[in-house]
């Protein structure tokens, strides 16, 4: 079940809290058995609508959900160890793609710290998964 679909929102687009709340209200009316005048082609339960709203209305939960969705839907070309990437000056890492595009694969330290390890090529549709370990700081 895709939470964006339940609330009739486009997956991956950025929404304000008010837009998510409005979509939630519309979905409640659309899928409520006593309120709906026409039966929609896809029917979700009120519990599914509430769950979708609960996840998407929380910034933290929404980010975790989006990361999980991306990782589940990504069919990556290969797994590449971070040590094979070229470290750039700005805290990013670069790895060339077989398509030859100069953009290649770029991943940042923030991406990796936030468990975003599936990286798309800047020039084609290929993706890779970055294999890495987060170093513990001695604080």
Curated annotation (Swiss-Prot):
SUPFAM superfamilies: Chaperone J-domain. Disruption phenotype: Sensitive to methyl methanesulfonate (MMS, causes DNA breaks) and hydroxyurea (HU, ribonucleotide reductase inhibitor). Its main location: cytoplasm. It comes from the Eukaryota. SMART domains: DnaJ. Pfam families: DnaJ, Zn_ribbon_CSL. Pathway: Protein modification; peptidyl-diphthamide biosynthesis. Residues 76-133 form the DPH-type MB domain. Residues 2-69 form the J domain. Keywords: Cytoplasm, Iron, Metal-binding, Nucleus, Zinc. Gene3D superfamilies: DnaJ domain (1.10.287.110), DPH Zinc finger (3.10.660.10). Zn(2+) binds at residues 97, 99, 121, 124. It is found in: Cytoplasm; Nucleus. InterPro entries: DnaJ_domain, DPH3/4-like, DPH_MB_dom, DPH_MB_sf, J_dom_sf. One of its GO terms (cellular component) is nucleus. GO terms for biological process: protein histidyl modification to diphthamide; regulation of cytoplasmic translation. One of its GO terms (molecular function) is metal ion binding. Required for the first step of diphthamide biosynthesis, the transfer of 3-amino-3-carboxypropyl from S-adenosyl-L-methionine to a histidine residue. Diphthamide is a post-translational modification of histidine which occurs in elongation factor 2. The DPH-type metal-binding (MB) domain can bind either zinc or iron ions. Belongs to the DPH4 family. PANTHER family: DPH3 HOMOLOG-RELATED (PTHR21454), RE24848P (PTHR21454:SF49). This is Diphthamide biosynthesis protein 4. The gene is dph4.
């Amino acid at each position: 079940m895709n939470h964006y679909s339940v609330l009739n929102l486009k997956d991956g687009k950025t929404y304000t809290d008010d837009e998510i709340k409005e979509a939630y209200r519309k979905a409640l009316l659309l899928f409520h058995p006593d309120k709906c005048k026409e039966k929609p082609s896809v029917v979700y339960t009120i519990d599914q609508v509430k769950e979708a709203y609960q996840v998407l209305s929380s910034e933290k939960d929404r980010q975790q959900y989006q990361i999980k969705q991306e990782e589940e839907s990504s069919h990556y070309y290969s797994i590449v160890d971070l040590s094979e990437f070229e470290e750039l000056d700005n805290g990013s890492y670069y790895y060339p793609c077989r398509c030859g595009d100069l953009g290649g694969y770029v991943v940042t330290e923030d991406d990796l710290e936030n468990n975003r390890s599936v990286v798309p090529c800047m020039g084609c549709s290929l993706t890779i998964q970055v294999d890495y370990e987060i170093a513990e700081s001695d604080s």
